[in-house]
C-alpha cells in the first residue's frame, strides 16, 4: 500500500556548517522516495548557506526532489512554514517541520507517520530529540502547556535515563525542532501565525489544536539529534531569545485569552519571577555590563508585547543609540566627543548620559532608557576614549 505523502520543510538561517548533514539525513530515510519531498526555506542567510546547498545538492534541486526557496527577507520560523505552503505538493498529508540543525535517524519519518496513522485525531507527532554533541542526553521530548500564564514546562530536558520515555504517550506539546503535522490542522484551525516571528508559534498552533479536541503523540521510535552549539549555554544571555520569547508570551496571552483575566495575573507573577531568576543567574555568571544589556532586551520584549508589536523586529537597529552610565567630568567630555563623532561621520546618534548611575544604583530614568538605547559601561567608555571615538555597540 502506498505510504502517505510527507513534505519535509527545513527552515534555514545561517547554518552552513550543518545544513548539508541535515538534508542528507532526510534523503537517507527508510521511507519510499516517491512519498516525500524536501522544501528548504532559507531566510536570507549571509554565511553562504544557499550556495552550499546548491553546490552539494544540485542534482536533487534540478529533479525537484529538493525545492529551495531563497527568500530575500527573513520571514522567521513561522513565516518559513507559511512560505512552504506556496510550493508544497498538492497531495501532501503530513508536513515534517524541522530546524536546519537537526539530523534525523534513518527510520524517523517512517515512525512518525506510523504513529500519526493510528488515528485521524493524531494531528501532531514528535519523537526523542537528543543533543547532537552528546547523543546520550535528551534535548527534550515535549512539554506540558500552562496556557493561562504562557509557560511550557519541558519534559525530558537534559535527561539521561531514557527508560522513562520508552513508551508512546500523549503530550500537550512536542519538541518543535522536529514534529510531524497533519494537513487536517490547516483545514480545521489554520496554520502558523507569522505575528510571532520566532518562539511561541509552535505553542500557539498546538494550543489551538488541543482546543479543537485533537491528540498530540510522542513516539520513542522516532529519533533526531539537535545541534545546539550555536546557542548560548545560558539562554538568558541570548538577546534574541530574551526579546522574542518575552514578546511572544504576551502576544500568546492577548490572542488566546481576550479579557484581562486571572491568566494575565498569573503570567505577571510567575513568568516575571522565572525571567528575573534567569537574568540574575546571568548577572552572577557574567558581568554587570552584559547583565544590563540583556535586561534591556527583556524589558523591550515585555513592552512590545503589551503594545502588540508583531512580526520581525530588528534588535540591532541602525544608528547609534547610547546610554552612558557614568559620573563626573569624564563622561561629559565623552558625550561631547560622541556628538562630534556623529556629526563628522553623518551618524544618527541618540545619546543619554545618566550621571552617577554606578554610585547611586539604577534610576527610573535608566530603566526607561533600556527600551530605546544601547548601553555603554565603564570598560566600553575606556575603549572609546583610547581609540578616539571608535564606537563599540
Describe the residue ranges of each PLM region:
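A short, conserved alpha-helix in the catalytic core of glycosyltransferases
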Residues: 172-181, 185-191, 195-223
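A conserved acidic beta->alpha catalytic loop
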Residues: 25, 42-51, 73
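Glycine-rich, basic loop-to-helix element that forms the pyrophosphate-binding segment
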Residues: 70-88
Amino acid at each position: 500500500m502506498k505510504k502517505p505523502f510527507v513534505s519535509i520543510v527545513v527552515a534555514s538561517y545561517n547554518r552552513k556548517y550543518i545544513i548539508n548533514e541535515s538534508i542528507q539525513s532526510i534523503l537517507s530515510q527508510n521511507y519510499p522516495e516517491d512519498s516525500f519531498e524536501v522544501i528548504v526555506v532559507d531566510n536570507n542567510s549571509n554565511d553562504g548557506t544557499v550556495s552550499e546547498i546548491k553546490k552539494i545538492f544540485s542534482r536533487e534541486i534540478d529533479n525537484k526532489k529538493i525545492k529551495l526557496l531563497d527568500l530575500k527577507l527573513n520571514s522567521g520560523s513561522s513565516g518559513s512554514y507559511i512560505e512552504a505552503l506556496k510550493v508544497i505538493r498538492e497531495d501532501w498529508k503530513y508536513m515534517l517541520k524541522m530546524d536546519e540543525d537537526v539530523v534525523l535517524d534513518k527510520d524517523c519519518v517512517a515512525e512518525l507517520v506510523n504513529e500519526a496513522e493510528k488515528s485521524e485525531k493524531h494531528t501532531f507527532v514528535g519523537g526523542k530529540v537528543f543533543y547532537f554533541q552528546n547523543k546520550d542526553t535528551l534535548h527534550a521530548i515535549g512539554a506540558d502547556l500552562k496556557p493561562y500564564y504562557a509557560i511550557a514546562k519541558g519534559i525530558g530536558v537534559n535527561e539521561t535515563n531514557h527508560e522513562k520515555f520508552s513508551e508512546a504517550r500523549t503530550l500537550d506539546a512536542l519538541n518543535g525542532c522536529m514534529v510531524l503535522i497533519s494537513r487536517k490542522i490547516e483545514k480545521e484551525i489554520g496554520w502558523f501565525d507569522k505575528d510571532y516571528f520566532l518562539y511561541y508559534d509552535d505553542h500557539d498552533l498546538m494550543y489551538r489544536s488541543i482546543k479543537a479536541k485533537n491528540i498530540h503523540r510522542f513516539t520513542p521510535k522516532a529519533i533526531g539529534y539537535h545541534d545546539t552549539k550555536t546557542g548560548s549555554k545560558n539562554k538568558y544571555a541570548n538577546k534574541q531569545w530574551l526579546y522574542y520569547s518575552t514578546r511572544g508570551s504576551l502576544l500568546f496571552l492577548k490572542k488566546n485569552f481576550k479579557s484581562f483575566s486571572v491568566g494575565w495575573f498569573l503570567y505577571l507573577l510567575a513568568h516575571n519571577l522565572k525571567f528575573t531568576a534567569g537574568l540574575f543567574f546571568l548577572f552572577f555568571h557574567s558581568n554587570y555590563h552584559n547583565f544590563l544589556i540583556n535586561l534591556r532586551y527583556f524589558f523591550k520584549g515585555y513592552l512590545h508585547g503589551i503594545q502588540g508589536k508583531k512580526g520581525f523586529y530588528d534588535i540591532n537597529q541602525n544608528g547609534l543609540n547610547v546610554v552612558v552610565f557614568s559620573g563626573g567630568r569624564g563622561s561629559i567630555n565623552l558625550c561631547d566627543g560622541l556628538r562630534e563623532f556623529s556629526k563628522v561621520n553623518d551618524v544618527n546618534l541618540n545619546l543619554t548620559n545618566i550621571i552617577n548611575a554606578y554610585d547611586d544604583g539604577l534610576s527610573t530614568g535608566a530603566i526607561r532608557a533600556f527600551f530605546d538605547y544601547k548601553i555603554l559601561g565603564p570598560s566600553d567608555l575606556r575603549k572609546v576614549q583610547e581609540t578616539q571615538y571608535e564606537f563599540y555597540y
